[in-house]
Amino acid sequence: MAVSSTTLSSPTPPECLQQQEAPRPPATRGRLVVLTGPSGVGKGTLVSQLRQRHPELYFSVSVTTRPPRPGEQEGVNYYFRTREEFLNLIEADELLEWAQYAGNFYGTPREIVFQKLSQGQDVLLEIELAGARQVRQQCPDAIRIFLSPPSLEELERRIRERGQDSEASIQRRLQQARKELDAKDEFDYVIVNDNLEQALQELEALLYPPSPGKGQS
């Protein structure tokens, strides 16, 4: 089955950027930020709040074979594709990274990411652990952040509170979460999401540190 490449076509990617923490002039490359954490830890909510405060940050919309949840929109939350279409994207090398999670495939369209970076725009990827490891191989200068729950028990409570998963699915997610938590030391930064506002402030401090001398008389 042919897959439309209107939004997912992929040229040969340029080299990855050098990590920079200070504000950059428009002519320089943007930063690639990778956010990873267990399902239910609050990545989506945190990203939504961050984007409201920093609309200049480009959020890369992932491709998935997961069925849309109520309220989700094509091209806004995800690009929804069949399994066959997704495999075609892999074969065509149109994905920067991809991984299988809870029986579904997830991946990041390659072209738009490098396009935004080359234009000097920061790009945020909210992806799974396996995908984050792939990005590390291709873009070692990416800023890698792990969002952790305060405890596994709290994570289970949040997943159950969503009311979207069967018991079998909850157990699979918790099993995967244990593996992901064991890998958090692979990341540059770890933020514990015990309080959303505090986690957001920590994330902002990492990505948008105050300019030297700001606030001083």
Curated annotation (Swiss-Prot):
Highest taxon of the lineage: Bacteria
Lineage, top ranks: Bacteria, Bacillati, Cyanobacteriota, Cyanophyceae, Synechococcales
Signal peptide: none
CDD domains in the record: GMPK (cd00071)
Name the record gives this protein: Guanylate kinase
Record's GO cellular component terms: cytosol
One of the record's GO molecular function terms: ATP binding
Chief location of this protein within or outside the cell: cytoplasm
Enzymatic class: transferase
InterPro entries: GK/Ca_channel_bsu (IPR008145), Guanylate_kin-like_dom (IPR008144), Guanylate_kinase (IPR017665), Guanylate_kinase_CS (IPR020590), P-loop_NTPase (IPR027417)
Region feature Disordered, mapped onto this chain: 1-30
Keywords: ATP-binding, Cytoplasm, Kinase, Nucleotide-binding, Transferase
Binding site for ATP: 37-44
Pathway per the UniProt entry: Purine metabolism
Keyword Ubl conjugation set for record: no
Species of origin: Synechococcus sp. (strain JA-3-3Ab) (Cyanobacteria bacterium Yellowstone A-Prime)
Domain Guanylate kinase-like: 30-208
EC number: 2.7.4.8
Keyword check for Metal-binding: no
Composition bias, Low complexity: 1-10
